[in-house]
Design a protein with these regions (language model features):
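Residues forming the flavin
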Residues: 1-187
Length: 187
C-alpha cells in the first residue's frame, strides 16, 4: 500500500525467491540488502565501484575529512556477498526481464595533483546473475543538461542528495509542473 493505493501481486516488486544485485554501497544500499533479505531473496550481492575501505582508522582521510572506513550494518550481518572495485557495464535480459549484469573490475590510481583518485577499467569482466537489480548509487552533484521542455526532474536528481521528505516535496512540485504542462502546454 502506498498513499492509500493497493498494488496487485503482478505490480508489486519483491525480492522473494530472486537473486538480488544491489549496485551501490551506502546507507541506501544497506537498506536494499535488509529489505531483500526480509522479503526472502534467494541471494543478495552488493557491488561498489570504490575499493574496499580499511577497517578502523584510514590515514587517507584524517580529521576533519569524512572518515572512509568499512561500515558493516545490521543489514549486512543478515547476509549478503559484498564486492568492491566493480563497475556495472551492461544489463543482460531475456524475454524483457533482467537476468544478469556485466561488471568490470576497476583500479583506482592516485591523482597526480593529490586530488580525487582516478578510475581505470581493467578489462576483466564477468556476468553476475540477477533477476532483481536495485540501484543505490550516489553522485557528486546534479549535472543537468538543458532538458527538453517535456522532461521533468525531481528529488536528488534535481537538487543533489538530501532528505527523503525534501525529495517528496520536490516530486510534488514536479507533478504540478507536469500537470500544468499537460493541461496548458506551458511550463
Amino acid at each position: 500500500v502506498l498513499a492509500g493505493q493497493t498494488f496487485s501481486d503482478e505490480e508489486r516488486i519483491t525480492a522473494r525467491g530472486k537473486d538480488v544485485l544491489v549496485i551501490g554501497g551506502g546507507d541506501t544500499g544497506s537498506d536494499c540488502i535488509g529489505t531483500s533479505n526480509r522479503q526472502g531473496a534467494a541471494s543478495v550481492t552488493q557491488i561498489e565501484i570504490m575499493p574496499k575501505p580499511p577497517v578502523g582508522y584510514n590515514p587517507a582521510t584524517p580529521w576533519p575529512q569524512w572518515p572512509v572506513v568499512l561500515k558493516t550494518s545490521s543489514s549486512h550481518e543478515e547476509g549478503c556477498v559484498r564486492r568492491w572495485s566493480l563497475s556495472s557495464t551492461r544489463f543482460i535480459g531475456e524475454n524483457g526481464r533482467v537476468c544478469g549484469v556485466e561488471v568490470e573490475e576497476v583500479d583506482w590510481l592516485p591523482a597526480p595533483d593529490g586530488g580525487r583518485p582516478q578510475m581505470r577499467p581493467t578489462g576483466r569482466k564477468e556476468i553476475l546473475k540477477a533477476d532483481l537489480v536495485l540501484l543505490a548509487m550516489g553522485f557528486l552533484k546534479p549535472q543537468l543538461p538543458d532538458l527538453p521542455e517535456n522532461v521533468f526532474v525531481a528529488g536528488d536528481a534535481a537538487s543533489g542528495a538530501s532528505l527523503v521528505v525534501k525529495c517528496i516535496a520536490s516530486g510534488h512540485r514536479a507533478a504540478q509542473e507536469v500537470d500544468r504542462y499537460c493541461t496548458t502546454g506551458q511550463r
